[in-house]
Amino acid sequence: MTVLRSLVLFGLAALAEIGGAWLVWQGWREHRGLWWIAAGVIALGAYGFVATFQPDPDFGRVLAAYGGVFVVGSLAWGVLVDRFRPDRWDLLGAGICLVGVAVIMYAPRGG
């Protein structure tokens, strides 16, 4: 259950951070306006809180592992929202990142 909770929280964090950054991008780079930027800033702020609900108490570990989730989530966002087509190197890199996430967060640790 702890691993499942952690994975759900990583997914929520990715949605908030990547979605927030995308909204800011749309507001500024695509000239959609300040409301898009404001919504992005709110989403980015929400991202900051999501990590605090991770079951692991170590900030550095949680954020380091989240970095790998961010890489995979960013590519997925690009595919689903912006019609980006990752190449094999993007996919290989994303897979390596997920292995890193698993090792950092879920490897057994002696006490």
From Swiss-Prot:
GO cellular component: a single term: plasma membrane
Main location per the UniProt record: membrane
InterPro entries according to UniProt: UPF0060 (IPR003844)
Membrane topology: Multi-pass membrane protein
Keywords from the UniProt entry: Cell membrane, Membrane, Transmembrane, Transmembrane helix
Localization per record: Cell membrane
SUPFAM superfamilies, A to Z: Multidrug resistance efflux transporter EmrE (SSF103481)
Transmembrane region(s): 7-27, 33-53, 62-82, 91-111
Superkingdom: Bacteria
UniProt keyword Cell membrane present: yes
HAMAP family per record: UPF0060
Stated family: Belongs to the UPF0060 family.
Protein name: UPF0060 membrane protein NFA_36830
Phylogenetic classification of the source organism: Bacteria, Bacillati, Actinomycetota, Actinomycetes, Mycobacteriales
